[in-house]
Amino acid sequence: MSNKVKPHINIVVIGHVDSGKSTSTGHMIYKCGGIDKRQIEKFEKEAQEMGKGSFKYAWVLDKLKAERERGITIDIALWKFETTKYVVTIIDAPGHRDFIKNMITGTSQADCAVLIVASSTGEFEAGISKNGQTREHALLAFTLGVKQMIVAVNKIDNTEPPYSEARFNEIKKEISAYVKKVGYDPKTVPVLPVSGWHGDNMIEPSPNMSWYKGWEVEYKDTGKHTGKTLLEALDNIPLPARPSSKPLRLPLQDVYKIGGIGTVPVGRVETGILKPGMVVTFCPANLSTEVKSVEMHHESLPEALPGDNVGFNVKNVSIKDIRRGMVASDSKNDPAIEAASFKAQVIILNHPGEIHAGYQPVLDCHTAHIACKFAELLEKIDRRSGKVIETEPKMVKSGDAAIINLIPSKGMCVESFSQYPPLGRFAVRDMRQTVAVGVIKEVDKTVAVAGKVTKSAQKAGVAAGKKK
């Protein structure tokens, strides 16, 4: 089993609506991936019959997406491909209405963002314009803590003339300046010309760009790397550190009821370790129970580590008691406690008016989606230096950064960014867009009351509500 040895990394694919994300993503999965060849042949045949032959890679992705949305499989294995060094999981294939929202909840899971920009005339400009998605996606990726970025300049076969060196250099210059402005160090961001459709520089170096000498990056820990393809760029990402020594935090993505097994919550271990036999507490339900088994890709695991997307079976818990957005933690080691309120540094990205105390948008934090009130605007700060410009401002508007005290409208489990990064960043959504992003500085936790403890948890010897 090659998978056992290779570390897993998660990537998120971002970029403007027609940049070719689906085709490029489809291509990678198709050529290096976990899709069974028979399945591909079936998809191809269907694509031909429906006159979608030219769309084959994107079509593969659409089929997978449809299956995922209809809940036919809980099998994330399809969204995988391997490089020499890593097993890569694509966490969210774009094109979703809620892509930005998923990106906020999902990006906390991404080790690397692959930003795809279209090089054809007009398309690049549209994506990078003031309200283009390229900008918003890149800024979100950085704010939400995605350490690595790779930029693929796509549709290079579609430039004037095709495979134009001048056009690539023009885009490379602009995109490097932009990722720098967002906060990335351009020295660590490979920018490469590709065709997701024809496959140029995706997996093998392109025969069509003799001018292209390759990308070069320099990482702090691993030094200089060069290469020509997207596959090599992914292969050279520094291995992300996994916070397995911290206490367990596992935000639930879904909860399934599986015949003959019972209730199976599914989510990704963000910090700590999940093992069978452990007694977990679900917050904010304040319910403790024993973990019977842990599975990943249909194989049972002795333990799940940060980065693992797993399902785990819990005893005596009804599917009605737990839901997406709750957090599982170890009842004996700094268990998660509901937040009464929390203080956060918030950057207002695009809000048409003024935001005053009392504003109540929806926050997306890890997998939770909950309305929270901006209870007090404490300080307005300079985005660059972090210095306080004004205390107790009357209002904030687009472009401002502020320290704000927030109160959730119902039970919500969040943590400070410094302790548990994935549970300490959020997006503020209103009017179907991302109005702001924030990082949690400190959390005022509710006083723990004795929660419900299932029989299996009592057997495993838990004192309810015993919190530090």
Curated annotation (Swiss-Prot):
**GO cellular component term of the entry, any:** cytoplasm
**Where in this chain does the record put each tr-type G domain?**
6-244
* Residue segments, region G1: 15-22
Question: What residues does GTP bind to?
Answer: 15-22, 92-96, 154-157
Which keywords has UniProt assigned to this entry?
Answer: Cytoplasm, Elongation factor, GTP-binding, Nucleotide-binding, Phosphoprotein, Protein biosynthesis
| Similarity field | Belongs to the TRAFAC class translation factor GTPase superfamily. Classic translation factor GTPase family. EF-Tu/EF-1A subfamily.
Protein known as = Elongation factor 1-alpha
